[in-house]
């Protein structure tokens, strides 16, 4: 190094200065481009990049994308796994059935399931109504979480205006109006107290009254509002029958479409009724329980202790009859054995006495003959 010529030193220092200046120049030129690229990427990601070719940024997005507020919204948690970003939706939703209608037209089991679906889809979904979304034809949707979708949300608009709470517009009749095709004749006696302060014989009559009055009436609690006031239950039922609009004849051409007012619930409602059968109203798309004998409650989960006797089903009745016949035969056999034993004992005693008398008689006669 000491032997280098001064000219060589000058050449070496000049080269180092040139490379340093070139590096600084390239860095200063690249910095505004990087800032502009990040700004364009942010605008494209937030949907504000109008007029910008965002397709060219798809490759670079994976290189610079990080977890921020826009990466995972609606209650999700953003997590980086290597070069991949994942949005984790940790919602511990309870399984209670409190249906809500979402802004996307889907019915969710409860509000928690709606928020979880919004997180998974990264879409803004809000509650538009409490209760299921009413639709003419239900169809499956997204995640299958007790959902059903339809084009109309919660109300049906027609020539009648707005038919709510399960009512249908009868446009074929001369007097166009809302008709309630709700048949509660097949429901067991399961008294409930409604939010209007009246008692009804079963929840079906509550839905019928809500449909007839076109106002919101729900089940407040199980059993009548005043347990001893049985007349209020029957009076409410008679009142509903008197004010009930005329229902079209069962030979209506729409009978094939309805196939009855109630249809069996889908597999999504498994376990909804504890001791009973789940039925879905075709018009209102609301689930209800037809409780087995001896059970009551909205979900047939309470034992009805007021019932004096329980009428068994056809299969159980057959078993009861067979058991009764077998028991009767056993009782008859036992009675016959007892009667046979009690009758043999006196005969044996009389036989022994006759033999003793004959013995005495023979000895007396023999002595007399001698």
Swiss-Prot record:
One of its GO terms (cellular component) is plasma membrane. Residues 261-301 form the EGF-like domain. It holds the Pfam family Kazal_2. This is Tomoregulin-1. Residues 356-370 have a biased composition (Polar residues). Belongs to the tomoregulin family. The keyword Glycoprotein applies. Expressed at highest levels in brain, and at lower levels in neuroendocrine tissues. Present in neurons from the diencephalon (at protein level). It comes from Xenopus laevis (African clawed frog). Keywords: Cell membrane, Developmental protein, Disulfide bond, EGF-like domain, Glycoprotein, Membrane, Repeat, Signal, Transmembrane, Transmembrane helix. CDD domains: KAZAL_FS (cd00104).
């Amino acid at each position: 190094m000491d032997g280098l010529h001064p000219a060589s030193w000058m050449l070496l220092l000049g080269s180092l200065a040139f490379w340093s200046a070139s590096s600084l120049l390239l860095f200063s030129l690249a910095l505004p481009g990087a800032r502009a690229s990040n700004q364009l990427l942010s605008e494209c990601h937030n949907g504000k990049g109008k007029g910008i070719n965002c397709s060219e940024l798809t490759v670079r997005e994976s290189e610079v994308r990080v977890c921020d507020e826009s990466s995972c919204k609606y209650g999700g948690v953003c997590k980086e796994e290597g070069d991949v970003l994942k949005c984790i939706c940790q919602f511990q939703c309870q399984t209670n059935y409190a249906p809500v209608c979402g802004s996307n037209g889907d019915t969710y089991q409860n509000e928690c399931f709606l928020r979880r679906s919004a997180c998974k889809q990264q879409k803004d979904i809000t509650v538009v109504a409490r209760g299921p979304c009413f639709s003419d034809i239900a169809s499956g949707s997204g995640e299958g979480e007790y959902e059903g979708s339809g084009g109309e949300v919660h109300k049906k608009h027609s020539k009648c205006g707005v038919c709510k709470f399960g009512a249908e517009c009868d446009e074929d009749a001369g007097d166009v109006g809302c008709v309630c095709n709700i048949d509660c004749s097949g429901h067991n006696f399961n008294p409930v107290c409604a939010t209007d302060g009246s008692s009804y014989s079963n929840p079906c009559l509550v839905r019928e009254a809500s449909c007839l009055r076109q106002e919101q009436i729900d089940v407040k609690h199980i059993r009548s509002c005043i347990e001893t006031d049985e007349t209020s239950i029957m009076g409410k039922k008679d009142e509903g029958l008197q004010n009930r609009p005329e229902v079209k004849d069962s030979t209506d051409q729409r009978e094939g479409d309805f196939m009855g007012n109630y249809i069996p619930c889908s597999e999504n409602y498994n376990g909804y009724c504890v001791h009973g059968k789940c039925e879905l109203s075709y018009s209102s798309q609301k689930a209800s329980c037809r409780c087995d004998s001896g059970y009551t409650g909205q979900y047939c989960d309470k034992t009805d202790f007021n019932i004096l006797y329980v009428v068994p089903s056809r299969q159980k009745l057959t078993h009861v009859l067979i058991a009764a016949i077998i028991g009767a035969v056993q009782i008859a056999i036992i009675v016959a054995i007892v009667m046979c034993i009690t009758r043999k004992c006196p005969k044996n005693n009389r036989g022994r006495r006759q033999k003793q008398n004959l013995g005495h008689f023979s000895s007396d006669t023999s002595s007399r003959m001698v």
